[in-house]
């Protein structure tokens, strides 16, 4: 894992979180308790702070990049950023899910429990309401979320963290077994947890 100080700022990573040895963390980054950062993720807090809330999961190949001082990234609690998602700034409230390959531009705000579907783009400055599902380039609302949908998102995020904790307890050197998501899935299929 590459952890680099930048401009006098060093990443702060909770001891209760897992950061893959194949990820890169640079500058003003705060990773709170029970966060999981998967392989290939690049988190660059060079120009503004990146703060990742408790129980959030950052999957393989996610890019978090602050391009200017006006583009901090705040990721709330129980958020899921799926493979290949890119955030160039923005504020994500709790229980947000950004799906595979989506692009979030600077100065956006994404409300509690919102879901941005695969390969969508959230344009600069857009305020996404709470509990909506959005899709497209640029995104449009395709449906509302119920309170139950939001609670299911919270459970899904919590599940990823708990699953990793169980695996880590079973394997003292779990990091070497979890270098890639496909290896992780193969392991899960072989073990009953």
Annotate each predicted stretch with a short phrase.
Residues 1-12, 46, 52-54, 60-62, ...:
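Glycine-rich hexapeptide-repeat left-handed beta-helix
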Residues 1-30, 34, 42, 192-193:
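Extended, small-residue-rich solenoid/repeat segments and analogous flexible loops
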Residues 17-18, 37-38, 77, 98:
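Short Cys/His-rich Zn2+-coordinating modules
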């Amino acid at each position: 894992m590459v952890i680099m100080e930048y401009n006098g700022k060093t990443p702060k990573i909770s001891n209760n979180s897992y950061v893959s040895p194949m990820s890169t963390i640079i500058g003003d980054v705060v990773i709170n308790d029970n966060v999981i950062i998967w392989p290939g993720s690049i988190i660059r807090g060079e120009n503004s702070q990146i703060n990742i809330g408790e129980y959030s999961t950052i999957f393989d190949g996610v890019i978090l990049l602050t391009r200017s001082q006006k583009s901090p990234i705040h990721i709330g609690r129980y958020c899921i950023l799926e493979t290949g998602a890119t955030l160039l700034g923005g504020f994500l409230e709790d229980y947000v899910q950004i799906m595979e390959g989506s692009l979030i531009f600077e100065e956006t705000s994404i409300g509690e429990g919102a879901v941005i579907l695969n390969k969508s783009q959230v344009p600069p400055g857009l305020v996404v309401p709470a509990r909506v599902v959005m899709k497209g380039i640029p995104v449009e609302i395709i449906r509302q979320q119920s309170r139950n949908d939001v609670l299911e998102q919270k459970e899904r995020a919590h599940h990823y963290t708990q699953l990793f904790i169980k695996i880590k307890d079973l394997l003292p050197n779990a990091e070497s077994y979890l270098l890639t998501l496909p290896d992780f899935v193969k392991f899960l299929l072989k073990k009953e947890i």
